[in-house]
């Protein structure tokens, strides 16, 4: 039986291809792209309970909560199509938790999406700014001025 974790002489052992591995590689590419644009990465894979933020970055004075979606370029779903209404709700709750944990309620914030398409080991990244608008999340959330700072009251 073939052991996918065995070390082959003269070659690095590699983990089998997995969704988690592809996602992690996409997040690496996304972080590198943002740093290359002069952004400062404040947190990666930040968690609060079951909530997670892929990347929390700073562009100028603005905090940016970045969701990263990585997909096969030849697949049926494009990366941006994976950002559903349910995912947007979870991102908002995660951002509120991050703002509370870091006493950053007075900071301007926004949500961006980095789409990573993979084809034959090549990664193509695209940044989409402001993927969550005030109209997307409705009025039942305490979000202050839409794209500005989210306030808990």
PLM segments and residue spans:
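Short acidic/glycine-enriched loop/turn segments that link adjacent beta-strands
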Residues: 48-51, 121
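Conserved catalytic cores of phosphodiester-cleaving nucleases, focusing on short active-site segments
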Residues: 34, 53-75, 91
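Domain-level recognition of nuclease-like catalytic cores that cleave nucleotide substrates
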Residues: 101-153
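Acidic-basic catalytic patches of nuclease active cores, encompassing PD-(D/E)XK
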Residues: 1-44
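Structural motif
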Residues: 50, 63-65, 108, 125
